[in-house]
Amino acid sequence: MPFLFYNQIIFYFCTMNFLIVGLGDIGKEYEDTRHNIGFMVADQLVKESNASWSLLKHAYYAEFKQRGHNVYVIKPTTYMNLSGKAMNYWMQQLKVSIENTMVVVDDLAIPFGSLRIKPKGSAAGHNGLRSIEATCGGQNYPRLRFGIGDNYPKGRQVDFVLGPFDKDEQKDLPALIDHSIKMIQSFVNIGIELTMTNLNTK
């Protein structure tokens, strides 16, 4: 407990840099697909923060202040399979540590409606995460896993992730995106451990 309290003091009184990486694919044909939920969360985060996007090297880029911290948000334009190229470039440019970088990603392994932050983990077959692992030095980076479930016939995984959310899911999306933003804001404000305890959903 003293250690957590000390960490909270650091978060409140030291200016820190954070990078939020929403994963997805560029192009109208990919808009509103399950695989692009990282882009959707990033878009809403930037909108609510009264920031705006600029098209820069390897990514759409936005920035804003939150409780004195610098928060940078990117949507890689490298396509999913080269997401690590954009993330590594902007980590270096902005001098953001891997511990302060949050990747927002769709996750087949957890049910739709489940939102879980974790400090590290495997790529679990996700090409965007594989690229990040290969380019950014391993598996020890925070990620926000947005559950999309695995309700698809055998052999149709690609069609499923590149397809739109169904009508019932679309009704729930605004609330889930809103909760995702609260998780990101909490990550910036009080750190990953307390955010996991307070805001992860099953």
Predicted regions and their residues:
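A hydrophobic, small-residue-rich beta->alpha segment in the mid-to-C-terminal subdomain
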Residues: 167-168
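Hydrophobic alpha-helical segments within soluble ligand-binding/sensing domains
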Residues: 125-128
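Nucleotide and nucleotide-moiety/phosphate-recognizing core
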Residues: 2-120, 130-144, 151-156, 171-202
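Short glycine-enriched, charge-decorated loop/helix-capping segments at active-site entrances
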Residues: 116-122, 161-164
